[in-house]
Amino acid sequence: MSWIPRGEPKLMSAACSPDTWQERMKDPRLAGSLQLQGALVQKYFQECRSELETGDNGYFTNLKTMMTMKYAPQTHPFLRRVVVNLPGNVKLKGLLGLKGDLKRRPLVIVRLGIFSNVEDFKPERAWLMMLFEQSPFNVLLLENMSSSDFVANNNQFSFGGYDEGIQNILVARLLSDPVEPLSQLVDSVHVFGISLGGHGVLFSSLLNKYNSPKNGALINSFTALCPVVDLRKTMVALTEGGVKSAFVDLWSRQRLTGLDKKLPALVTYDSFAFLSKAISEIARTYHGGLSYISSVRLPPEMKDSSDFWALNDFWKYYKQVEQPVLIYATEQDPAVPFNLNSELIQNKDLKIDSKNLRVIELPQGVHCTLPVPYDWHAITSLFQSYILSHSPGFKMVERTLDVDLSDEEWAGFFDAGSRVKFEVQEPSKKSGFVTIEMEVENAKGKEKSMNLSLPLSQFDFRFLNPELSASEQEMIVRWLNQNLKLRIQPKNGKYALRATWSVAQ
């Protein structure tokens, strides 16, 4: 049942080409206004709906497809396990993705969803492929505090945006600290969170205002996919009766093995009431932020306390956030109901005094299964261009290869409507090149085929092992499908095939 995402671009009209909208997103005139950027994204989904949507809109199709992607991040040569040590003796496990060079790049902190840890995360694999493999960013993927690994490795336990938001600030400080060797590879820091991990992204966007140095933002941008906005009501919706709640309860028991050793009251619980009792016990025994220290500045009038629910309802303090916060939310969402969460921001039911917060509402998808009902290439382009637009110090350089097509075989073939379709062939384990199979079509519908070989040494990764692993082979295909541009180039009455791709400068 598993499948390997390739991220293949499909031919779209010029008006709906992801490349066109990506360049618009990176326009410096828009980067200063999140409302304009958000309006542009919403407009893209509305005006290009027929080309962006794949037709895979079924509820179970979306869930099954997101859960069955074939990917082995734990054995990926470019990903390594790390442990981040935080105040309060908190240990946070992560996967660090580095391109293998010494270039300063934007680094994206990815916060996983409920119960997810770096040894076992499924739907979030798509975002790791998009942000690390297909984009010019380095990535630090961090477990959710509700994961079994976090329970096993820490004496205290909690969950939610208050604690994870503080963690995000502390991790961003580490990544920006000149004493830390990793900081030498960091151009700017960005945070990207999913579901319950999105709640911490939202709180850290508020904390960022009070914890950034005078010379610039600590964190440059925030992205939240189907985030929890109202933690208490979302938890009630997950645990209050029905088949869904019974399934979630069984799932939580399986994923939180060992929690009863940290919360003795969980030794006994009523049928299908494990999660609700766990949540109640966490709130009852909460003593304040697990990693809260006085150097983390909270908003005025907000104090660290033992009131779990009050601390996680931080919206009354949410004023004039300075860095952009872009939320993607799907109307269909059984896990984080849209009407209880992102819709509160969109409809202004939450009185938020900030122009740097914007919701993109999407009609297709189930709990942000965006790469299933929408074009993978386009989604990646939107994520990539948003982060790039808020990384002003990061520059890219375009690599170009021209192939002369003036010989007899191509005589009279080309016209103003000529275009190129391509398919990337997976390179062999010992190859230093990758083959691109192309079909060139002119305006009359005639087609010709040709192949092109490109050297791996010219891409945005440094391949140091004598043989490519399966993960690297698949990554190369995805990277080229996202970044390779091919076109027929007229020059002095002749024609050439021009291949271009961009890499970090």
What positions do the PLM features span?
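Serine-hydrolase catalytic core
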Residues: 247-366, 374-383
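Short, surface-exposed "cap/lid" segments of acyl-processing enzymes
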Residues: 99-136, 140-145
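N-terminal cap/lid segment of alpha/beta-hydrolase-fold proteins
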Residues: 52-100
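Alpha/beta-hydrolase-fold enzymes
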Residues: 194, 200-293
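Alpha/beta-hydrolase active-site loop
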Residues: 158-181
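Alpha/beta-hydrolase fold nucleophile elbow
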Residues: 183-195
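Short beta-to-alpha linker loops that shape the active-site pocket of alpha/beta-hydrolase fold enzymes
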Residues: 143-148, 228, 365
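Glycine-rich "HGGG/HGxG" loop immediately N-terminal to the catalytic nucleophile
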Residues: 146-158
